[in-house]
């Protein structure tokens, strides 16, 4: 059994960005069931919507999102994501992510903002048409060279370990995770009081999907079983 301050399951943009921040506060391990770059992030094209221009605003972006969401969006969540997006983009750029730029009418360099369906303003930051690959490659390079982060590739998260499953008294909480070391054919135990599921979605449960074949909802199932 190996113990860490933080366990991260998944190696896409969510898992890698969390690991880089958490590493300032303790030891981190990332467990991912394939090679680290094979998550859905690398397949993401388009770009990232973020208010960047004077003609745009948070309120306009929120309104566009709510209209496109057709009543399915939680407005508070939408507003939080929209208002925190500029700082998140600055963090990505600090990590070395390069978004496409252009020259304005006065010869100054600026972000080459795109406009996609459902957006009334130009607000899409992109890196050609392979934005996800650019983000993934830069974050993964930083993770691999960070002395406080351990990356376990080909380690399939099998199940969360909870106090209830161990028969311990008190409120049920997660204390670790079982992972299958696919190279060795062994189930290993990772121990931590802080476990973050960054396992993506479950698009592959449907017959027709553009999701990669790893999007099988493993994290969703583990969370449900943990209660």
Located regions from the model:
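Core beta-strand elements of the Rossmann-like FAD/NAD(P) dinucleotide-binding domain
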Residues: 2-4, 184-194
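Glycine-rich loop(s) and the adjacent beta-strand/alpha-helix scaffold that form part
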Residues: 194-227
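Short amphipathic alpha-helical face segments that pack within enzyme cores
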Residues: 17, 134, 138, 217-225
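Hydrophobic/aromatic ligand-binding patch that stacks against planar heteroaromatic rings
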Residues: 17-22, 40, 195, 222
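N-terminal Rossmann-like FAD-binding beta1-loop-alpha1 element of flavoenzymes
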Residues: 6-30
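Conserved N-terminal/central alpha/beta ligand/cofactor-binding core
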Residues: 27, 32-186, 204
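Anion (oxyanion) recognition and catalysis
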Residues: 23, 93, 224
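Structural detector for helix-capping/boundary residues
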Residues: 11, 155, 193-194
